[in-house]
């Protein structure tokens, strides 16, 4: 299964509360924080929802 590194590129101040919960589910709380995830259908949906706040790199 493919792995990706997800980095929060923009601040979560002033965004929709549901998007903030999605960031927390991804393990991201602060700007510049990164986490490694396995690419799953659930993760793809989360990345599509809050992609405007993130930078995604394939490993």
Curated annotation (Swiss-Prot):
Signal peptide: none
Domain of life, per lineage: Bacteria
InterPro entries with a match to the protein in the record: Ribo_uL30_ferredoxin-like_sf, Ribosomal_uL30_bac-type, Ribosomal_uL30_ferredoxin-like
GO cellular component, one term: large ribosomal subunit
Keywords: Ribonucleoprotein, Ribosomal protein
GO biological process: translation
GO molecular function: structural constituent of ribosome
Assembly behavior: Part of the 50S ribosomal subunit.
Family: Belongs to the universal ribosomal protein uL30 family.
Protein name listed in UniProt: Large ribosomal subunit protein uL30
Organism (species): Leptospira biflexa serovar Patoc (strain Patoc 1 / ATCC 23582 / Paris)
């Amino acid at each position: 299964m493919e792995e990706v590194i997800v980095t929060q590129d923009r601040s979560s101040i002033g965004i929709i509360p549901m998007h903030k919960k999605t960031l927390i589910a991804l393990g991201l709380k602060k700007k510049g924080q990164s986490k490694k995830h396995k690419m799953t259908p659930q993760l793809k949906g989360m990345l599509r929802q809050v992609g405007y706040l993130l930078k995604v790199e394939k490993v």
